[in-house]
């Protein structure tokens, strides 16, 4: 997770998310030897996969791909689809237009998956997309919204995502499982903050911390499977 910032043409300097300069010997030769002319003046989060750069800007629901000496092309787009009301409100059904605006908070590209996090109507959602099977899983990051006792929805999560009915775990997966992902760096920070607070389950926090500390350095994302009780 870096910030790409070009200082002088055609030189590109590399910084981490804290604006700390990264030495060129830490950047792959295939990148440092290329100009990436089309990215001049751009400063935004991006992923590097092989010799391709994937990036998004804050105000566009689109992930772009750019190769050395080529212009960016749209490769993935976050679309919410059309809204359908809950089952118990079908008699009041009214179609709504597709949402023209969502905010991508984070995106990561791997060989087999696209990981995304976006904000829509003040709620954050995570997307796990399988590039091979084209299957996707979408869940809110605030798990309190998945409590059917919550007033947010009488039957589950308000589905502004793909035009289907509201859903609770039984409508996300036939087996009552929900898939999500976590940024390892952010999760470490949250665990560290939790250690200093009084936790309801300190033993679980301890196990999570030990698991994170045992991860290889090149692991950036954790995929989690949540099982409905």
Regions found by a protein language model. Give the residues of each.
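Short beta-strand elements that form the blades of beta-propeller/WD-repeat-like
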Residues: 1-6, 11-13, 44-65, 101-126, ...
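Short loop/turn segments that connect beta-strands within beta-propeller blades
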Residues: 15-20, 66-70, 130-133, 229
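Surface-exposed loop and turn segments in beta-propeller and other repeat-based domains
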Residues: 19-41, 73-98, 137-163
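A short, polar/proline- and glycine-enriched secondary-structure boundary/capping micro-motif
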Residues: 34-36, 65-67, 85-86, 126-127, ...
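Charge-rich, low-complexity N-terminal segments
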Residues: 59, 70-72
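Generic structural motif
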Residues: 83, 121, 185, 228-229
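C-terminal/domain-terminus segments
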Residues: 123-151, 189-206
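C-terminal functional modules
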Residues: 190-228
């Amino acid at each position: 997770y870096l910030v790409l910032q070009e200082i002088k043409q055609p030189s590109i300097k590399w910084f981490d998310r804290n604006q700390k300069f990264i030495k060129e010997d830490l950047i792959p030769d295939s990148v440092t030897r290329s100009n990436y002319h089309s990215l001049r003046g751009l400063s935004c989060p991006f992923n590097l996969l092989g010799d391709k750069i994937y990036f998004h800007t804050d105000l566009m629901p689109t992930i772009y791909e750019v190769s050395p000496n080529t212009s960016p092309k749209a490769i993935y787009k976050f679309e919410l689809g059309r809204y359908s009301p809950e089952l118990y409100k079908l008699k009041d059904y009214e179609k709504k237009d597709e949402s023209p605006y969502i905010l991508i908070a984070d995106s990561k590209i791997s060989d087999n998956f696209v990981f995304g996090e976006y904000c829509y109507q003040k709620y954050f959602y995570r997307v796990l997309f399988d590039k091979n099977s084209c299957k996707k899983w979408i869940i809110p990051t605030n798990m309190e919204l998945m409590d059917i006792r919550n007033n947010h929805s009488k039957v589950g999560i308000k589905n502004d995502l793909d035009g289907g009915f509201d859903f609770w775990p039984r409508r996300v997966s036939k087996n009552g499982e929900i898939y999500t992902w976590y940024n390892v760096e952010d999760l470490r920070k949250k665990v560290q903050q939790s250690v200093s607070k009084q936790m309801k389950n300190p033993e679980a926090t301890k196990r999570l911390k030990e698991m994170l500390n045992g991860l290889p350095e090149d692991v950036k994302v954790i995929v989690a499977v949540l099982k409905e009780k």
